[in-house]
C-alpha cells in the first residue's frame, strides 16, 4: 500500500509493508489506570483511532491491541491511601477510561489485555531471558534485565549506553529493587513482594512471590496477541524512553523481531507545558463537555497532526465547535434535502475519495491536507444546496461524510447523531410544509453563522443572531450546538 508513517527509530518516513500481506498488527500502550482520564491521556487513543479507520478503509484487516496497566507502584500507593483494594481502584479507573474512549467515538480495540491477566506469559518471558543470558536474579526475589548484554540497546532513542545513568523511569525507582543490581542501568523484570503490600498484589514465581516490572507486560502481551513480529508499535512521545527502549530490548533479547515501525504522538500542552496532574493543569472530559459537545473535543484532538503538540487554550474548544457546527449544518441540510446516504454508500475506498484527501492521509496522516480536501467538497455541497441540485447534493453528502468518518467525525453517524449543530430545530416540523420551510431557511442562516464563527468573524455571527431575534427566532448555543426556537 502507499501509506507512509514517520518511524521514530529511523527518524524518517517509512512505507507500511505489512508483515502478513493484507493484515496490520498494531500495539498501542494504553492507560495506567491509577486515576481519572484527562484530555492529554486520550490523545493517543484518538490519533490511533484515525489510523485504524484509514487502514480499514484501505481494505486491510487490523488486529489492534491496547493494553491496560492495572497494577503498579502508583496504583498500590494511591489505593492504600484511600483505603480501597488495589484491584477495585484499578477497575474503577479502567471503567472511566473506557467511558471516555466511547464518549469520543474511539473504536474498541481487537483485544484490550490487562497486565494482571497475563502473569504466566510474563513469568515465561523472564525465564526465557534468564536462559538466554540477558537477565539475572539477585537472590532476594528480584530479577533484572542486563542492559549491557543487549548490543542494540539505545537504538530506538539514538542514545549510547555509556552516556546513560539509569534506564528506569523515576517513578519506578525504589531502594528495594536498586540494591540487587549488578549495573545501575539495569531495570527490573520482577519485583519481590514487599512487607505490608496486599497479598493479592503478588504472584508465585520461580524467584519468589512478586509482580512484574512495568516494561515487561507490553513485550509479553504483544507476543501473545501479535507474535514475534508485528507492524506498528505506538504510544505517547514521553514513552519512547525508557519504556519503549526497554520493551524493544526485552523482545529483541528474547529473539523476536518485535515492532517494524514506531509511531509516537505528541503531547497536549497548556501554556507550553505537558498536561499533567502533577502540574495541576489537566482537563477532564466531563469538565470539557459541560459547555461543548464531545464531538468538539474529538475535533480538537483529531484535526492537528499527531506529531504536533496541541496547545490547549481558551479558544481551542470554541474554535473546534465552530468548525464542527459548519460541517454538521451541511450534513443536516443535505439529509433534509435528499435523505441520508446508506452505510454502504459511505464506505468509499481511497481510490473513490478525492485524490487530495487520499494522498494526505497516506502521507503520515496529514490531517491538515485531508481537511483542506473536505472543505473543498463542503463548498461544492453548499453550492449544490443553493442550486437545488439533488444529485450533486447527494454526491457531496457522501463525499463529506465518508471523509469525516475516517477521522471519526461523521455528524450523522450514530455516535454523533444527537450532537449535531447548526440546524437543530427545537420544535418538531412534522409534515407541515410551512414549518419545514422555516426550518430550512433558519438552518441556512445558522450555517452562515457557523461559518462566521469558524472564521472568527464575531460581528457577522452576532448580526445573524440579532436578525433572527428580530424575526422572533431565539438562538441558543449549548453543548450540543446551536438550536433555535420561536418566541
Q: Which residue stretches match the model-derived regions?
A:
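N-terminal, positively charged nucleic-acid-binding surface of large information/translation enzymes
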Residues: 10-15, 19-107, 125, 484
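Short Gly/Ser/Thr- and Asp/Glu-enriched loop/turn motifs at secondary-structure junctions
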Residues: 108, 138-140, 477-481
Amino acid at each position: 500500500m502507499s501509506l507512509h508513517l514517520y518511524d521514530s527509530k529511523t527518524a524518517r518516513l517509512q512505507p507500511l509493508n505489512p508483515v502478513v500481506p493484507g493484515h496490520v498488527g498494531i500495539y498501542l500502550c494504553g492507560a495506567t489506570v491509577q486515576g481519572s482520564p484527562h484530555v492529554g491521556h486520550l490523545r493517543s487513543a484518538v490519533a490511533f483511532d484515525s489510523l485504524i479507520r484509514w487502514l480499514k478503509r484501505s481494505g486491510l484487516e487490523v488486529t489492534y491491541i491496547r493494553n491496560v496497566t492495572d497494577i503498579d507502584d502508583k496504583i498500590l500507593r494511591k489505593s492504600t491511601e484511600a483505603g480501597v483494594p488495589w484491584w477495585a481502584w484499578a477497575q474503577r479507573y479502567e471503567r472511566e477510561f473506557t467511558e471516555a474512549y466511547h464518549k469520543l467515538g474511539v473504536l474498541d480495540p481487537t483485544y484490550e489485555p490487562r497486565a494482571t491477566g497475563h502473569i504466566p506469559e510474563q513469568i515465561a518471558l523472564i525465564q526465557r531471558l534468564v536462559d538466554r543470558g540477558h537477565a539475572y536474579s539477585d537472590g532476594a526475589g528480584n530479577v533484572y534485565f542486563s542492559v549491557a548484554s543487549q548490543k542494540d540497546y539505545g537504538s530506538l532513542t539514538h542514545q549510547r549506553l555509556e552516556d546513560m545513568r539509569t534506564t528506569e523511569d523515576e517513578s519506578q525507582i525504589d531502594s528495594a529493587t536498586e540494591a540487587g543490581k549488578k549495573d545501575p542501568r539495569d531495570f527490573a523484570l520482577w519485583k519481590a513482594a514487599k512487607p505490608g503490600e496486599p497479598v493479592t498484589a503478588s504472584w508465585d514465581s520461580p524467584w519468589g512471590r512478586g509482580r512484574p516490572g512495568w516494561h515487561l507486560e507490553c513485550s509479553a502481551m504483544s507476543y501473545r496477541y501479535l507474535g514475534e513480529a508485528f507492524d506498528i508499535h505506538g504510544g505517547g512521545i514521553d514513552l519512547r524512553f525508557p519504556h519503549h527502549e526497554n520493551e524493544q530490548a526485552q523482545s529483541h533479547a528474547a529473539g523476536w523481531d518485535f515492532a517494524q515501525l514506531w509511531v509516537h504522538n505528541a503531547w497536549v500542552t497548556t501554556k507550553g507545558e505537558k498536561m499533567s496532574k502533577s502540574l495541576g493543569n489537566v482537563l477532564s472530559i466531563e469538565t470539557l463537555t459541560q459547555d461543548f459537545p464531545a464531538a468538539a473535543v474529538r475535533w480538537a484532538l483529531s484535526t492537528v497532526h499527531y506529531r504536533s503538540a496541541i496547545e490547549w487554550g481558551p479558544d481551542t474548544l470554541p474554535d473546534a465547535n465552530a468548525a464542527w457546527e459548519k460541517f454538521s449544518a451541511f450534513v443536516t441540510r443535505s439529509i433534509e434535502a435528499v435523505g441520508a446516504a446508506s452505510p454502504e454508500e459511505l464506505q468509499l475506498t481511497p481510490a473513490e475519495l478525492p485524490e487530495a484527501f487520499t494522498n494526505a492521509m497516506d502521507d503520515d496522516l496529514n490531517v491538515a491536507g485531508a481537511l483542506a480536501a473536505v472543505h473543498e467538497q463542503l463548498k461544492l455541497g453548499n453550492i449544490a444546496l443553493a442550486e437545488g441540485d439533488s444529485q450533486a447534493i447527494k454526491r457531496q453528502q457522501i463525499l463529506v461524510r465518508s471523509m469525516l468518518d475516517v477521522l471519526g467525525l461523521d455528524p450523522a453517524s450514530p455516535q454523533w447523531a444527537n450532537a449535531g449543530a447548526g440546524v437543530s430545530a427545537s420544535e418538531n416540523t412534522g409534515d407541515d410544509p410551512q414549518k419545514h420551510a422555516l426550518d430550512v431557511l433558519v438552518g441556512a442562516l445558522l450555517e452562515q453563522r457557523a461559518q462566521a464563527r469558524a472564521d472568527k468573524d464575531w460581528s457577522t455571527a452576532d448580526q445573524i443572531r440579532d436578525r433572527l431575534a428580530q424575526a422572533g427566532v431565539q438562538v441558543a448555543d449549548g453543548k450540543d450546538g446551536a438550536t433555535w426556537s420561536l418566541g
